[in-house]
Amino acid sequence: MRVQILDLPSFGYHFITQTHIPRGKDEYYLRFSQSAEPPRAWRPLSKEEIHTLIQKGNHCDTWHDVLVADPFDASLIRNSSFAGLVRIASLERRLLRYHDFTVPTGITHSTLISCDVGENCAIHHCAYISHYIIGNHVILSRIDELCTTNHAKFGAGIIKDGEQEAVRITIDPLNETGGRKIFPFVGMIAADAFLWACHRDRTLLMQRFESMTQQQHDTRRGYYGTIETQSVIKSCRIIKDVCFGPGSYVKGANKLKNLTVQSSLQEPTQIGEGVELVNGVIGYGCRVFYGVKAVRFVLGNNCALKYGTRLIHSVLGDNSTISCCEVLNALIFPYHEQHHNNSFLIAALIRGQSNIAAGSTIGSNHNTRKNDGEIIAGRGFWSGLASTLKHNCRFASFVLITGKNYPAELDIPFPFSLVTNNERENRLEIMPAYYWLYNMYAIERNEKKFAARDKRKTKTQTVEISVFAPDTIGEIENALALLDSAIERAWVNAGNSALTAEDIVLKHPTKAQTIPVLLTGIEHSTRSTLVLKPLEARKAYRDILIWYCTKTLLSFFEQTTRCISHFTSHDPKTITHNWVNMGGQLVPEDKFETLLQNIETGKFKSWHHIHKEYDALAATYETDKALHAYAVLCSLARTRIDAPLLCTYVQHAITIEKYRVTQIHKTRCKDYLNPFREITYRNPLERNAVLGTPEEDQLIRTTEEESAHLCALYARYIAPPHLG
């Protein structure tokens, strides 16, 4: 585009071309409709005020198009220029302070073009402000360029009247080729992106999502950018086509373009030094600081991007933090952590509560003829230091990858497992139920830390943070079946007569311990995959199922005053065992399918209606979860659960709960029994002063209190009359 030469009288006018102005309207009709406040009594400047303004070094070719509202002190405007229709609300001699930054109200050394300015604002050294509606008590200081175009989308993936499809901004999560593209919109959450990106085979569903997104935003040209009340923007270079919510704080940003910054006085969003953000939607209460580069992205509420993060073509769920690293083409559910500057995450679906360690390279994009690989990981995925994974891989929930190079694709169906590449023996090794067996403290800490980190005031969706929940329980059921098959196969391959896994464990436990259990279909290679401690893992999985199901049922009975007879009318075989992690919210698979069908048939007309349905699904979650626990326990018992049988399982669960609490304490104590942990301290007293003792550990104390309550609950329901 070439530099254009304009006539002076047209400067500041004709924001919307005549072809896009409806009959009977003018170029300001949308601008006037954007103000949420009661109409002000705008008036023209008096001759005395114009004289004062000129004396103060101000310039305007059309002073009659500068309107003000009383009280108005013209002496507070100095060395500034105005063009087009400029409206300035009441302006009095005041000071505005934000933290330690204090400035006087007024407009100095600035240029305003067709803008509305709210009450008692401070605008200083802003070289170019064009087509913005500025709220009350806003501070704008030392901004090079702040402008809005007539076709601004403010981060939404829509096209305006008269535009071609080619200009639409899309995001390509999970796959770099664009085959899973979605249209971002204000209010989008990880669940929306999941529905859209992960069901591409449903053509009608895709069409509904596209039309809903396009219809959610007004396609008319001429909307102004907004900087809402109590916002502070200072020392920035270029800001173009950005809407800022109330209480936004921006300092030292290099470039902000085509964004919506959602913010409120209760959940202010902050953007800091050296940041460059283009084509995105930022949630409430976010912090984006120190050299972050993000392009084509959606941030959930209470997210943080820091220290040079590169986030491109990605959707990040609520309560997540990414620092220093590179994340491309990723769909990440809530509570993700990635802190180190030498990790990257490429083309992946991470289902939240996850952690990518230093040196982790998740996704080698060049192991196929095209950059079309994908990685899918369940909740709680944790890649160890310097681990390397290649596309395509799939992981169950709470899988810990040790720091190794994994040369082939992986499909790990065992939740709570430890995976390692044994290079000496040239084999992959998996320890199912590792966390339950050897790191119970980490399981408990996970749940507690996520609850503590949830600072959201705006909660669009109910997110499950409990480690043991319907999704992980379903994975345990599937893993248990695979483990049983592997044990039975190993038993026969060792020259024994065929037996069920249960009989092998009960009748030949010692002999079974000596037989290696191998798996197939886990790694895309010719080498073997060995299961570590398969019998212990089998028992652990069964204990988890019993403990979880009894705990869930009895908690439900306590909350609702219902009993086991409430479920006996249900055929457990008709209750779905499979649940879907829908952006952090857990939904039974059959209800999830109904949701998709209702969207396809047009029952839900907008994303707002879909979000309401998320709430409706959340409202039945506790009942659905209890029903699921009943079905799982019936499957485990191979019969319907009645009051006496439930009593038996409750007695077993008491033993498991005591083991669980003991293991939490025991796994924490390991840190104190390790002699190498002592070498940086002069004596145990210094160590305890720094770290505290296991007995003082708040997590352990809280867990013991919760366990006492649970055991008391179990005790109350031991007698069959209470269960029936």
Swiss-Prot record:
Q: Could you name the domain of life of the organism this protein comes from?
A: Bacteria
One of its Pfam families is DUF4954
**Family annotation (InterPro entries):** DUF4954, DUF6819, Trimer_LpxA-like_sf
Listed Gene3D superfamilies: Hexapeptide repeat proteins
* Protein name per UniProt: Uncharacterized protein TP_0851
